[in-house]
Amino acid sequence: MENVLKNDWEPLLAPEFEKEYYLTLSSFLTEEYSTHVVYPKVEDIFNALQYTSYENTKVVILGQDPYHGPNQAHGLSFSVQPGVKTPPSLLNMYKELRDEYGYEIPNNGYLVKWAEQGVLLLNTVLTVRQGEANSHKGKGWEHFTDRVIELLNEREKPVIFILWGRHAQAKKKLITNPNHHIIESVHPSPLSARRGFFGSKPYSKINTILANMGEREIDWEIPNL
């Protein structure tokens, strides 16, 4: 999996593609893609970084690993491709958005509109074998995505990090720059959403911070397709 980045992430992450962990990961992925069904498609692996450049990143919403069902994953955390049923966690995200802003719940889970406005939808692991959650955990992606977080941490311009659930909150140790903002709650999963995700108002908190910085707020409304 060579460096296919086309924006300002390319020079920042180029050294990672030469490191031993990444070369090992790349060999593993070449084998996996040739012998199993793996998501997302190879050309979509780095979509989070392609849609949201380093300089344009305002918000990071950290996910875990990609959806492992057919036609779901396309390289953005929580997002699914058009024409696919909205997964339960994303549906709860939409319910919270409806409660905050009054937006109708859309008929799709395609979050590219957020990514294009500076919301980096980053999973900590970027690939998965079909039907096997966490099957690519511990293969090297964590080193790579930790570096993405570290690079954003080095920025002077503030970033708002959204850490939902224990897995995302484990990355808080990488966010040491006091310029940045962290918004935490339990995960929007149906297992935990009622224990503190619903009512946490993350979207309006983000926009309040952006407005106070003089930045354009995020238009969170996802249109019907």
UniProtKB/Swiss-Prot annotation:
Gene Ontology MF terms in the entry: uracil DNA N-glycosylase activity
A GO biological-process term: base-excision repair, AP site formation via deaminated base removal
Source species, domain of life: Bacteria
Enzyme active site: 65 (proton acceptor)
Catalytic function, reaction form: Hydrolyzes single-stranded DNA or mismatched double-stranded DNA and polynucleotides, releasing free uracil
Alphabetical list of HAMAP family matching this protein: UDG
Alphabetized PANTHER family for the sequence: URACIL-DNA GLYCOSYLASE
NCBIfam families listed in its UniProt record: PRK05254.1-1, PRK05254.1-2, PRK05254.1-4, PRK05254.1-5, ung
Protein name stated in the entry: Uracil-DNA glycosylase
